[in-house]
């Protein structure tokens, strides 16, 4: 087990995997393709979708949005606790990413179905802009807005089922089980707080369109220059291998 963990966390091994992935991409003459997994009733997807168009403008990539449905049950040991925490977390952090999150509870299934139907019909090039509008309407409980969008973006129930099924299969094939994540050449970047790591990787590969190297997604907060306390504290660090 220790040997496996050392291999997993080895920076040398990490770089080797990246080098092989890039060599394979070049040999196959493939563009820089970034997959984005979007789940309409995932609170974190409401955050990530606000950065799609900015990301596409900043990097020379082939961007492929993929609509996904329910998570793999095997990945959720405490489903209720997980969903409750996701909602609470996004309510707390949305403003720090300059995103308005209107949700106070999870949307009704009827609205979720309409949101999926609309996005099933959306052209990939306009997915970012339409998905933002859909997400705001969904989490606001704005049925009228979703019905208005349905006039322009129509999908049959079977088309939605097939789209979500295909999206789930692609997602599962990437060893991932949720929404709100970006996937590039064997690596997953889950949520807005990890998007900068994908940006760093693409910048190293020369895929950025400008030379300013300013991140697309930046947390809107500033820590104090110095921290003072009247007494010492014990800090426990729990690293996540996610």
Each language-model region and where it sits:
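Non-catalytic pre-domain segments flanking phosphatase-related domains
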Residues: 5-31
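Short strand-loop junctions, especially beta-strand C-caps/beta-turns
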Residues: 37-39, 187, 238
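Short, well-ordered beta-strand elements
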Residues: 33-36, 233-237
């Amino acid at each position: 087990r220790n040997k496996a963990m050392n291999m997993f966390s080895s920076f040398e091994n990490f770089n080797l995997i990246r080098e092989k992935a890039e060599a394979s991409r070049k040999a196959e003459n493939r563009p820089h393709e970034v997959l984005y997994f979007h789940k309409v009733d995932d609170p974190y997807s409401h955050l990530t979708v606000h950065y799609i168009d900015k990301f596409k403008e900043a990097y020379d990539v082939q961007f492929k949005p993929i609509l996904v449905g329910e998570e793999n049950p095997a990945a959720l040991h405490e489903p209720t606790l997980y969903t409750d925490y996701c909602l609470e977390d996004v309510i707390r952090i949305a403003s720090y990413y300059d995103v308005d999150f209107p949700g106070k509870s999870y949307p009704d299934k009827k609205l979720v179905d309409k949101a999926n139907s609309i996005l099933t019909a959306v052209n990939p090039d306009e997915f970012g802009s339409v998905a933002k509008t859909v997400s705001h309407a969904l989490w606001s409980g704005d049925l009228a807005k979703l019905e208005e969008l349905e006039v322009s973006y129509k999908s049959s129930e079977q088309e939605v089922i097939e789209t979500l099924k295909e999206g789930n299969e692609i997602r599962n094939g990437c060893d991932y089980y949720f929404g709100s994540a970006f996937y590039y050449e064997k690596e997953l970047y889950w949520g807005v707080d990890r998007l900068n790591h994908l940006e760093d990787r693409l910048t190293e590969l020369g895929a950025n369109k400008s030379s300013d190297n300013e991140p697309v997604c930046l947390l809107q907060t500033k820590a104090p220059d110095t921290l003072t306390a009247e007494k010492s504290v014990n800090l426990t660090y729990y690293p996540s291998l996610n």
